[in-house]
């Protein structure tokens, strides 16, 4: 037993929640931001300005999300070079086969492949062959075995969302907003789920509100700890960056989730806020302002179809309030209550 412990220590294989659920998960979120999310922002900018070069550039970046996440995980696990480079293939396969659960599949599979690769690294005279073979075979093999089931499990969130859309507007607003918002922050793809469900209309509006509550909520309430960089990366990128901190203290998730439970029914019952653009926009929130652009293109389409007379000041006010103002104000209020209760403290929202 002592020999095993000595071997694991020598290989820097540390099997702890801190290493896997905080360090690896936090790094994975940064990898996602540096590929899918920044690519989405660039692509959206290109689409709105008519610059095809930006659309292409953004497309290349988003296509590399799996490899980027896997390499980020490998970096967090202190993988040697050959293991780290081999994770590019592992990340691609896990993300491609994982569907809506792609990020979660990458997390699980890349961790296993990383540790197996580290275990054999520099143990043979043909390390240049053995290490990549073990890392890639184990990672791609696991991807073929479990990535699709992980994706199917993540897609079950869609079943819950569809049930929620059948409820009364008040209840539907709360449930859809909270569920899609939570899915956006988790290492699964809320955008893929919404796209698969064709989530538009009033339910799409509630989903947009829920996603914005998470992203803007985390961005604004953590401004003191993360500054402008954190404000932009979370507000225009993803609240998934906070997953490592959520694992350490789940109570930091309460404020934005409560905010989404308020903005959702306001969207459905008060403002009749609809998202009639591409369904994928319902699960994007303020990432690259894709959610808001989806709402706007929906307005334009409705006008062209004759179902909407014009875009009114009330429409713009609803978007600004539901997507930016209320998520910021409500999350800060709830955050201060949590601080007074001693549930969260300085540094709990700090991003590395």
Feature-to-residue mapping (PLM):
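Pore-lining transmembrane helices
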Residues: 1-352
